[in-house]
């Protein structure tokens, strides 16, 4: 991994204390998205990691609603593969499958179109940030329902103190930046 590129990415993540509620330190990726060099570096770094581990053995990138959509298509293009969308409930037309995940107060659902993938296709799930792992686990469940193979989950940022990586069990996980 290129240290100068990683530093370019890291410098574009800013922190907002007590947002959206007191006690939360919000990691904002907006400056990264505004800077084409930093954004390109983030895509190159994620793609380089995936190429080194999986070579040409990835069929699709699955982007998670909503900020995973910012990285999914660009990462897919860099790897020369397609991108599928995993959306919040009620946002996809046609027949869908759904999986629930817990929120701090209640639950939410993700959906994928039933014909998004074929059994056995190898998929990498991407999101901007991994916190508790609830969303990523629900996405893995959806892909398992389609009998696709989740080869890895990746994110730009990981909040290590929330232990989301542990919830993924045996599924490999990679993040460019880690914060407590």
UniProtKB/Swiss-Prot annotation:
PTM annotation (Phosphothreonine): residues: 135
GO cellular component term, pick one: cytoplasm
Subcellular location: Cytoplasm
One of the protein's GO biological processes: AMP salvage
N6-acetyllysine, modified sites: 114
InterPro entries: Ade_phspho_trans, PRibTrfase_dom, PRTase-like, UPRTase/APRTase
Top-rank taxon, per record: Eukaryota
Catalytic activity: AMP + diphosphate = 5-phospho-alpha-D-ribose 1-diphosphate + adenine
Chain positions with Phosphotyrosine modification: 60
E.C. number(s) listed in UniProt: 2.4.2.7
Single GO molecular function: AMP binding
Enzyme class at the top of the EC tree: transferase
Chain positions with Phosphoserine modification: 15, 30, 66
The protein's annotated pathway: Purine metabolism; AMP biosynthesis via salvage pathway; AMP from adenine: step 1/1
Chief subcellular location: cytoplasm
Family label: Belongs to the purine/pyrimidine phosphoribosyltransferase family.
Free-text function comment from the UniProt entry: Catalyzes a salvage reaction resulting in the formation of AMP, that is energically less costly than de novo synthesis.
Subunit field text: Homodimer.
NCBIfam families (alphabetical): apt, PRK02304.1-3, PRK02304.1-5
Name this protein carries in UniProt: Adenine phosphoribosyltransferase
Species name: Mastomys natalensis
Lineage: Eukaryota, Metazoa, Chordata, Craniata, Vertebrata
């Amino acid at each position: 991994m290129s240290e100068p590129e990683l530093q370019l990415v890291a410098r574009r993540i800013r922190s907002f204390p007590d947002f959206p509620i007191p006690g939360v330190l919000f990691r904002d990726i907006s400056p990264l998205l505004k800077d084409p060099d930093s954004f390109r570096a983030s895509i190159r770094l994620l793609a380089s990691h995936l190429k080194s581990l999986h070579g040409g053995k990835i069929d699709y990138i699955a982007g998670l609603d909503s900020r995973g959509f910012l990285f999914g298509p660009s990462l897919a293009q860099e790897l020369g593969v397609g991108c599928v969308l995993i959306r919040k409930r009620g946002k996809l037309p046609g027949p869908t499958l759904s999986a629930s995940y817990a929120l701090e107060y209640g639950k939410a659902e993700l959906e994928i179109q039933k014909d998004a993938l074929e059994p056995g296709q190898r998929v990498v799930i991407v999101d901007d940030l991994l916190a508790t792992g609830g969303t990523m686990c629900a996405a893995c469940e959806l892909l398992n329902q389609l009998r696709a193979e989740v080869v890895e989950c990746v994110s730009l940022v990981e909040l290590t103190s929330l232990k989301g990586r542990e919830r993924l069990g045996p599924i490999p996980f990679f993040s460019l930046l880690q914060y407590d």
